[in-house]
Protein backbone atom coordinates (compact mmCIF):
# COMPACT_ATOMS: atom_id res chain seq x y z
CA UNK A 1 0.00 0.00 0.00
CA UNK A 2 1.29 3.44 -0.83
CA UNK A 3 0.70 6.32 1.58
CA UNK A 4 0.69 9.86 0.27
CA UNK A 5 0.48 12.80 2.62
CA UNK A 6 -0.92 15.94 1.02
CA UNK A 7 -1.72 18.00 4.13
CA UNK A 8 -1.02 17.66 7.88
CA UNK A 9 -3.18 14.89 9.33
CA UNK A 10 -4.46 13.86 5.90
CA UNK A 11 -3.11 10.55 4.67
CA UNK A 12 -4.28 9.05 1.41
CA UNK A 13 -3.72 5.46 0.30
CA UNK A 14 -3.99 4.21 -3.26
CA UNK A 15 -4.10 0.49 -3.85
CA UNK A 16 -4.98 -2.16 -6.38
CA UNK A 17 -6.85 -5.31 -5.40
CA UNK A 18 -7.29 -8.26 -7.77
CA UNK A 19 -9.71 -11.18 -7.57
CA UNK A 20 -9.70 -14.57 -9.29
CA UNK A 21 -13.09 -15.72 -10.59
CA UNK A 22 -12.07 -19.39 -10.69
CA UNK A 23 -11.47 -19.63 -6.92
CA UNK A 24 -14.32 -20.43 -4.57
CA UNK A 25 -12.74 -18.71 -1.57
CA UNK A 26 -12.76 -15.37 -3.47
CA UNK A 27 -9.11 -14.80 -2.70
CA UNK A 28 -8.01 -11.16 -2.98
CA UNK A 29 -4.57 -9.71 -3.48
CA UNK A 30 -3.40 -6.29 -2.44
CA UNK A 31 -1.06 -5.04 -5.14
CA UNK A 32 1.55 -2.39 -4.54
CA UNK A 33 0.92 0.48 -6.98
CA UNK A 34 3.59 2.03 -9.13
CA UNK A 35 6.07 4.08 -7.12
CA UNK A 36 4.42 7.46 -7.36
CA UNK A 37 6.05 10.85 -7.42
CA UNK A 38 2.66 12.38 -8.09
CA UNK A 39 -0.48 10.29 -7.51
CA UNK A 40 -2.27 11.70 -10.56
CA UNK A 41 0.59 10.83 -12.90
CA UNK A 42 0.81 7.38 -11.29
CA UNK A 43 -2.88 6.61 -11.87
CA UNK A 44 -2.95 7.88 -15.43
CA UNK A 45 0.17 5.89 -16.25
CA UNK A 46 -1.74 2.60 -15.83
CA UNK A 47 -4.72 3.68 -17.89
CA UNK A 48 -4.25 1.33 -20.85
CA UNK A 49 -5.80 -2.17 -20.78
CA UNK A 50 -2.43 -3.81 -21.49
CA UNK A 51 -0.74 -1.99 -18.59
CA UNK A 52 -3.61 -2.72 -16.20
CA UNK A 53 -3.42 -6.41 -17.05
CA UNK A 54 0.32 -6.30 -16.31
CA UNK A 55 -0.37 -4.86 -12.85
CA UNK A 56 -2.80 -7.68 -12.03
CA UNK A 57 -1.48 -11.14 -11.06
CA UNK A 58 -1.77 -14.02 -13.54
CA UNK A 59 -5.30 -15.39 -13.83
CA UNK A 60 -6.99 -12.38 -12.23
CA UNK A 61 -10.46 -11.65 -13.60
CA UNK A 62 -11.04 -8.23 -12.03
CA UNK A 63 -9.01 -5.40 -10.60
CA UNK A 64 -10.29 -2.88 -8.08
CA UNK A 65 -8.65 0.50 -7.75
CA UNK A 66 -9.50 2.22 -4.50
CA UNK A 67 -8.46 5.33 -2.65
CA UNK A 68 -8.92 5.67 1.08
CA UNK A 69 -8.33 8.58 3.42
CA UNK A 70 -6.52 8.18 6.75
CA UNK A 71 -7.04 4.38 6.71
CA UNK A 72 -10.68 4.56 7.76
CA UNK A 73 -12.81 5.81 4.87
CA UNK A 74 -12.88 4.70 1.26
CA UNK A 75 -12.87 7.84 -0.80
CA UNK A 76 -13.75 6.27 -4.12
CA UNK A 77 -13.22 2.96 -5.83
CA UNK A 78 -13.68 1.51 -9.24
CA UNK A 79 -13.73 -2.14 -10.30
CA UNK A 80 -12.58 -3.20 -13.74
CA UNK A 81 -13.44 -6.51 -15.41
CA UNK A 82 -10.13 -7.54 -16.95
CA UNK A 83 -11.75 -10.01 -19.32
CA UNK A 84 -13.89 -7.36 -21.08
CA UNK A 85 -11.64 -4.35 -20.61
CA UNK A 86 -11.56 -1.81 -23.46
CA UNK A 87 -9.49 1.32 -23.80
CA UNK A 88 -12.61 3.52 -23.86
CA UNK A 89 -14.00 2.17 -20.58
CA UNK A 90 -10.57 2.35 -18.97
CA UNK A 91 -9.98 5.97 -19.90
CA UNK A 92 -13.40 7.05 -18.64
CA UNK A 93 -13.05 5.09 -15.39
CA UNK A 94 -9.60 6.43 -14.56
CA UNK A 95 -10.42 9.98 -15.65
CA UNK A 96 -13.43 9.96 -13.32
CA UNK A 97 -11.41 8.44 -10.49
CA UNK A 98 -8.61 11.00 -10.82
CA UNK A 99 -11.13 13.87 -10.97
CA UNK A 100 -12.83 12.66 -7.79
CA UNK A 101 -9.50 12.37 -6.01
CA UNK A 102 -8.51 15.89 -7.08
CA UNK A 103 -11.76 17.31 -5.77
CA UNK A 104 -11.56 15.59 -2.39
CA UNK A 105 -7.88 16.46 -1.94
CA UNK A 106 -8.71 20.13 -2.54
CA UNK A 107 -11.58 19.99 -0.05
CA UNK A 108 -9.46 18.16 2.52
CA UNK A 109 -6.59 20.64 2.22
CA UNK A 110 -9.03 23.53 2.69
CA UNK A 111 -10.59 21.88 5.76
CA UNK A 112 -7.23 21.06 7.35
CA UNK A 113 -5.99 24.60 6.67
CA UNK A 114 -9.10 26.13 8.27
CA UNK A 115 -8.82 23.87 11.34
CA UNK A 116 -5.10 24.73 11.71
CA UNK A 117 -5.84 28.46 11.51
CA UNK A 118 -8.58 28.21 14.16
CA UNK A 119 -6.24 26.30 16.49
CA UNK A 120 -3.57 28.98 16.07
CA UNK A 121 -5.99 31.72 17.08
CA UNK A 122 -7.29 29.75 20.07
CA UNK A 123 -3.87 29.09 21.60
From Swiss-Prot:
Source organism (scientific name): Saccharomyces cerevisiae (strain ATCC 204508 / S288c)
Record's miscellaneous remark: Partially overlaps SSM4.
Organism domain of life: Eukaryota
UniProt name for this protein: Putative uncharacterized protein YIL029W-A
